[in-house]
From Swiss-Prot:
This protein binds to the 23S rRNA, and is important in its secondary structure. It is located near the subunit interface in the base of the L7/L12 stalk, and near the tRNA binding site of the peptidyltransferase center. Belongs to the universal ribosomal protein uL6 family. Part of the 50S ribosomal subunit. GO terms for molecular function: rRNA binding; structural constituent of ribosome. The gene is rplF. GO terms for biological process: cytoplasmic translation. This is Large ribosomal subunit protein uL6. It comes from Chlorobium phaeovibrioides (strain DSM 265 / 1930) (Prosthecochloris vibrioformis (strain DSM 265)). GO terms for cellular component: cytosolic large ribosomal subunit. HAMAP family: Ribosomal_uL6_B.
Length: 179
């Protein structure tokens, strides 16, 4: 049995789970999330706990078991607490600022890069070298953070670029001068 899939999920008091035909809907103080449900797994709700069980032991059922347990857990956490991803900008003259609902990035190119967050994602710049991506959908937060990081990935020689908080950039040594 899946180590992740067999663990029950604690349903927070402020979160509400609705299971309909092939669809999951989780609502809470921060918003509402929906997820289509495959027929290989079923979701059972008991008092304060939610369990995900698989129908049979096929390879696909085993794969979906752990996946849907984590998706449901992330949905419950998202509508109650929310998710935040922090990006750090390193480099001389590199900075970020909010211009209305657009994120304006100066990353050493001849032009500024403007990025509009999709619906359900909030962007903040507490200081010029930090970008906070927050919202209730963990997958969407990660996708938006990866998109912003892709504008100028950290390079290994000087470490300039946009990186996740806590990400370690393996540094390389430059070419050694010959005699």
């Amino acid at each position: 049995m899946s180590r992740i899939g067999k663990m029950p999920i604690a349903l927070a008091k402020e979160a509400k789970l609705e299971i309909s035909e092939g669809n999951l809907r989780v609502s809470g103080p921060k918003g509402v999330l929906e997820q289509a449900l495959v027929e290989e797994v079923k979701v059972l709700q008991e008092e304060g706990l939610v369990k995900v069980e698989r129908i049979n032991d096929s390879k696909r059922s085993r794969a979906m078991h752990g996946l849907y347990r984590m998706l449901l857990s992330n949905m419950i956490e998202g509508v109650t607490k929310g998710f935040t991803r922090k990006l750090e900008i390193a480099g001389v003259g590199f900075r970020a600022e909010m211009k209305g609902d657009l994120l304006a990035l100066t990353l050493g190119f001849s032009h500024m890069i403007y990025f509009k967050a999709p619906e359900g994602v909030k962007l903040e710049t507490p200081d010029p070298v930090t970008v906070l991506v927050s919202g209730i959908d963990k997958a969407l937060i990660g996708q938006v953070a990866a998109k912003i990081r892709s504008f100028r990935k950290p390079e290994p020689y000087r470490g300039k670029g946009i990186k996740y908080e806590g990400e370690v950039i393996r540094r390389k040594e430059g070419k050694a001068a010959g005699k």
